[in-house]
């Protein structure tokens, strides 16, 4: 089971994020949720799951998983994810900047990302700002989402650090794997 799946589930369980947007990944010719045990575990944890297959941007159909403590949150995330998909062309070009920006803002909010990071991501995309070395180095050193240039440390403390501490406590094997990547920040 992938670290992104586990950290997404954990983020919801510790109330860091209202919902998680995951992918039913293919592993060894089967999909993650083909293992019914995982669905049973999610149910025992009190989590709801909505599944939807989409195939925009490629010929491959991707099954998205909207996971939260309530079906209402799952459906809200699904709604905004669809809005995002509808605001871009098959090639990924933004068709409606206002709809695209609002969809990304709402998705970031539902995923629990710091607002400063979400707003900078939207601004960079809308204004077509080049991804410079500072941008690339922030991507290289942080997990989970694109941190803003100005508030990177505050965002790390508000989201990443809380999730990483929970991963250390509840998912020690995953923590070990994630900490092996010495380029990524962990508890500092």
Question: Where do the protein language model's features map onto the residues?
Answer:
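A conserved ligand/cofactor-binding region detector
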Residues: 1-95, 103-106, 113-188
């Amino acid at each position: 089971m992938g670290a992104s799946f586990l950290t997404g589930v954990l983020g919801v369980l510790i109330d860091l994020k209202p919902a998680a947007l995951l992918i039913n990944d293919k592993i060894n010719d089967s999909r993650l949720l083909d293992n019914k045990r995982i669905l049973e575990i999610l149910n025992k944890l009190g989590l709801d799951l909505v599944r939807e297959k989409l195939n925009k941007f490629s010929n491959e159909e991707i099954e998205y998983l909207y996971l939260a403590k309530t079906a209402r949150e799952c459906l809200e995330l699904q709604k905004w994810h669809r809005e995002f998909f509808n605001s871009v062309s098959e090639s990924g070009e933004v068709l409606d900047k206002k709809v695209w920006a609002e969809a990304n803002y709402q998705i970031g909010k539902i995923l629990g990302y710091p607002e400063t990071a979400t707003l900078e991501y939207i601004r960079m995309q809308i204004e077509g700002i080049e991804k410079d070395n500072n941008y690339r180095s922030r991507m290289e050193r942080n997990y989970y989402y694109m941190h803003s240039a100005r508030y990177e440390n505050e965002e790390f403390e508000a989201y990443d650090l809380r999730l990483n501490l929970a991963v250390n406590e509840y998912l020690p094997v995953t923590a070990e794997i994630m900490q092996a990547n010495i380029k990524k920040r962990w508890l500092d």
